[in-house]
């Protein structure tokens, strides 16, 4: 009996010192769900309807709303005008917002980057290869989506 107490203590100590399995990073609840990089029609005219034909969709797969104020979407270039910053916008649980490249009136489901004019310079997404980045208000990468194909007009992420 006198041996039982030290033996139990040894087992408890050994169990406490056993390293836990590494935790896997949780999948983001807000992510880029689609990039439509080749607007309909050819050639790309730079008209607002054509520019709005390219867009990125951001989806909240979580169970609670997420405040996107200060979050950014950008492509892989380092150009400052290729960054969209969310203003006051809350993405409800299970919902998707479409961010169109051109100009328009923002709604609860569609936002507009505000780019226009400049012909093909109004477009954001390259038609053959690019990467979309979604960052939170602190600048931390939340999700990215890359494509490398001219055989399709869009990429589901």
Regions found by a protein language model. Give the residues of each.
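A structural motif detector for short, solvent-exposed N-terminal "entry" segments of globular domains
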Residues: 2-10, 19-69, 121-127, 147-156
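Solvent-exposed beta-edge/loop recognition patches
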Residues: 24-30, 42, 81, 88-157
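A mature extracytoplasmic/lumenal domain signature
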Residues: 36, 62, 70-72, 77, ...
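A short linear-motif detector with a strong N-terminal bias
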Residues: 36, 51-53, 76-78, 112-113
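Residue-level detector of beta-strand face positions
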Residues: 57, 72, 131-133
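The feature marks short-to-medium sequence segments in extracytoplasmic or secretory-pathway proteins
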Residues: 66-91
């Amino acid at each position: 009996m006198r041996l039982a107490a030290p033996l139990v203590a040894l087992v408890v100590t050994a169990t406490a010192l056993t390293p836990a399995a590494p935790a896997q990073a949780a999948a983001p609840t807000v992510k880029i769900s689609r990039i439509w990089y080749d607007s309909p029609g050819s050639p790309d005219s730079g008209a607002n309807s054509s520019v709005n034909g390219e867009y990125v969709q951001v989806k909240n797969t979580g169970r609670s709303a997420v405040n996107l104020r200060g979050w950014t979407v950008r492509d892989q270039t380092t150009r400052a005008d290729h960054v969209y910053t969310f203003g006051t916008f809350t993405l409800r649980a299970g919902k998707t917002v479409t961010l169109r490249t051109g100009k328009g009136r923002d709604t609860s489901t569609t936002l507009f980057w505000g780019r226009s004019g400049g012909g093909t310079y109004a477009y954001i997404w390259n038609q053959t290869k690019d990467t979309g980045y979604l960052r939170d208000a602190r600048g931390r990468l939340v999700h990215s989506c890359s494509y490398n194909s001219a055989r399709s007009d869009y990429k589901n992420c």
